[in-house]
Amino acid sequence: ASCLVGSEMCIRDSYKAHDVHICIGTGKHLSDKNRLKYAGNEFYFKSQDEMFSLFKQFPEALENTRALTDSVDLQIPMEDYHLPWYTIPGDKKSKDIDEYLKTLCSSGLKDKYENINTEINQRVDYELSVIKKMGFASYFLITADFVEYARKNKIPVGPGRGSAPGSIVSYALGITNIDPLKHNLIFERFLNPDRISMPDIDIDFCVERRGQVIDYLKSIYGEDSVTQIITFGKMNARAVIRDVGRVMSYSYSEVDKIAKMIPEGPKVTLDQALKQNSDLRTVSQTNYKDLIDNAKVLEGMTRHASIHAAGVVVAPGDLTDFVPLYRSSQGDVTTQYDMKELESIGLLKMDFLGLRNLTVIDKTIDLIKQRFNEDIDIDKIDMEDPKVYKLFAKGLTVGIFQFESAGMREFLKKLKPKGIDGLIAMNALYRPGPMQNIDRYIKRAHGKEKVEYVHPLLEEALKETYGIIVYQEQVMQIANIIAGFTLSEADEMRRAIGKKIRSLMDKMADKFVKGAVKNGLSKAKANQIFDLIDKFAQYGFNKSHSVAYSYIAYQTGWLKTHYTAEFMSANLTSEMNNTNKVVVLINECRKLNIKVHAPDINKSGINFEPLNDKEISFGLNAVKNVGVKALEQCIDCLLYTSPSPRDNLP
């Protein structure tokens, strides 16, 4: 025999909050009679002395329990990586994984560049040396393999995402479709040899076929080695007030008033809100004390679990050898560890994101093929088409990826971008924080405000953005040029500033100033430049990501410019479940002199379809409460009774 007690909470004083938590999870109120409830307040984690006191009449059971716990020797290795081993194809000469990666890169570069110069060779050799040193060749080969699978099976893949476009190895392997040298992207922003951590390659796929790529991974590495990742919905300050208030039967108006006293934002805590808001402090000391007290205990706890929208994990063997699994009520299997925890134990996690806009591009290309029998390779379109930039300059960007908000359209009209660099900068600037620099950027771009640099050495890093820090990579360049930092050190400085790690920031500031002085700057000027970096770097955007997403924006803009009816039809079809968005897109069609016909069971199909350059038939699947199967039956009947119902369109 051994001694055990049920432990539902850490300390006895949490029993009231625990009762509230049960009600939140079961959708009950504290006042409900027939609800799940623990008897008493003893279901907490007991101390050693408490256990001895409880079971003092059973000394043998106590000894058995001690022996049992002493025999447990659980060690979870946190330093090792557990990457699945990439199997080199049997017909390949090289059996060394690093050599094989090098061979694939050499082959890929020939497809990407007409002339492979010294700069290209040096960059590739450097990146490969870092990848070899860090032991990540398998990671790149595995990623390249499933991306190649997607492309071969005509599953739309994005040009890149996050910091991965900063790698020429990723470009050579076809993982990304962005030339990092052309856009002055920095490898260390993606993979820092001084900071041992897994590379992070996020991939965008067509939203409708993302699952097919996951199935491919399972077919290669085994069903038991690949699964999706759990994510936990946490109770933040506002949410926990609303949940606790409901369970304690306070009126909606009372709870709503208290919740709105808390500043918005996921990182705002109740303690912070209580310090900032005197009204909330007053409330917490009066009739709502129990509500606030229970909410403070439950704040940050898990409310529910769900499947991460993008996360996939691949293990070198059965996942159960590395991580516990969870089966949802719907039967879906995920890890019990979230993304950060999986990374901490060294498992390979990837983000497979379903991007609607890639589906729109794919559907548009299909419609073009149907109407004109033309094959469009979206990755090979002219990236300097003045007609496309004219569309952006007019602000006609409804339906254009990343550029369709009203505020963005107004800034585009002012900027009038004439090249991809303008789109990249605007994409990075139109975000909270850097948005304050947009007007200044536009004035300088048009020569209405003088471009000035705090020091002439800054021109090299800031010339492309008219002296304004826009990108995180520019912060790294400044540290490299001014203070002599290596790009790895510069990335550490960028991270410290971006994440506001004060101890590391102070250390980096001291090193920056000393390096700048050694480079001939005065201490005052060095401090001035670091203060400038500190001010803007926390808002700086990842240029690699901005470049990749601006490419998608341009591709959608190109399709809208040259195949307007097809593009708008595909966009409308992709948004059929969003009535408000359908209305916005139909209004845009009117501005473009394209008529969207009213739904007509005799003339419409399931999806929106272009009838000609100026007319689109309404997709019946956009009609609420009408299912696809019913529509298919109706259309089959029409096809049976009338071979060409659309021939009668006005």
Predicted regions and their residues:
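Noncatalytic, beta-rich nucleic-acid-contacting surfaces in large DNA/RNA-processing enzymes
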Residues: 90-642
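Flexible glycine/acidic-rich beta-alpha junction loops that bind and position SAM and/or redox cofactors
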Residues: 8, 12-18, 80, 84
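Acidic, His- and aromatic-enriched active-site or binding-groove loops in soluble protein domains
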Residues: 21-29
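Conserved small/polar residues in nucleotide/adenosyl-binding loops
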Residues: 4-5, 9-13, 640-647
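Phosphate/diphosphate-binding loops
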Residues: 31-66, 197-221
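Structural signature of the thiamine diphosphate
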Residues: 60-84, 234
